[in-house]
Amino acid sequence: MERGGTVATVVQFSSPGTVELVECSPATLTPGMVRVRTWYSGVSAGTELTAYRGSNPYVTKHWDTEQRLFVDGAPSFAYPVAGWGYSEVGEVVELGPEASGLQVGDVVYGIWGHRSEAVVAADRLAAQKLPAGVDPLHGVFFRVGAIALNAVLAADVQLGDRLVVFGQGVIGLLATRLAVLSGAHVAAVDGIRRRRELAAGFGAEATWDVAPEGGVGALARQWCGGGADAAIELSGNYRALHEAIRSVATEGTVVASGFYQGGADALRLGEEFHHNRVRIVASQIGGTPVRLGDRWNHARLLRVFGEQLSRGTIQPGPLVTDIVDADQVGAVFAKLDAGDPDTLQVVLRFDAPEGGRQ
């Protein structure tokens, strides 16, 4: 069995505005664990960018796990912060004692952070083998696909519903596609033309810029009369959240699934939210909608998304705009921070085999 090297590498946010690939010691392989060598790691342009900018609440406040409140005090994470990242794909290279369900050579996906290798629980990864026929590069989409599917479930989409999806980044585009597969008529909203084009390719019946005359709310009423059944907001922009509220019908549902930062001056809750009795539902990958009970959990989200990849009903290839060596991570985050309009899914390449594996 292959063993970890004497030196590993991990992406570290050294301070706000500074991110780099640094050396670290390989983790010790213990019973029930496996060592995974990373091939690819997808970069989040939302959560991880908040760590780069220093705006993530975990680096400014303390998360009280018992009260589930952010409170004043020592931040939960202090710079330098290493090991963030939640969209990894790699190969099992070593089995620890008592590890079962996996073999050396298995290709798996999961969460172990932007690092060259990791030691992960075998029982966790045994259910996360890359499905046959799925390009390993596309394995970076499992987590974001689960986030998108969770938002669609929160919207309670029914066959024939009219749904507006705000924000056509990676998660927004996947949500658009999943909503179409669920039987919804979808309108996609984004300020970048290329993203609107991708949304149309994913099945959106209408695509709108973010600031049409009269606002998106007026367009939604022209599109379906009386407003949409539901809207999903995935940009993390308060103005977009306000327009999502304006776009739905009386007593319609808005799913707030973006990672919102700072104050909410653009959110006017005394207007359509109040007078149309709009319901706002938060969607976050830490849990699935309560009304679904125990039937849906994180594992099922991953499994269902993987089934769509295997069937080819979701084709995420066009969403990958950048594949870069991990040691170029500083340039990657500078580009994301600048808001490059052509960038969607950036993938860090660690030790992927030549040509990948089909």
What are these regions (language model features)?
Residues 1-4, 245, 296-358:
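C-terminal hydrophobic helical "lid"/dimerization subdomain
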Residues 27-42, 54-112:
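Glycine-rich beta-strand-centered segment in the early N-terminal region that forms part
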Residues 33, 40, 106-107, 117, ...:
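Residue-level marker of beta-strand positions
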Residues 83, 111-124:
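A structural motif shared across PLP-dependent enzymes of the aminotransferase-like
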Residues 135-212, 218-219:
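Mid-domain Rossmann-like dinucleotide-binding core that forms the NAD(H)/NADP(H) cofactor-binding site
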Residues 205-281:
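Glycine-rich cofactor phosphate-binding loops and adjacent beta1-alpha1 units
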Residues 217-221, 225, 267-320, 331:
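C-terminal substrate-binding/catalytic core of Rossmann-like NAD(P)-dependent dehydrogenases/reductases
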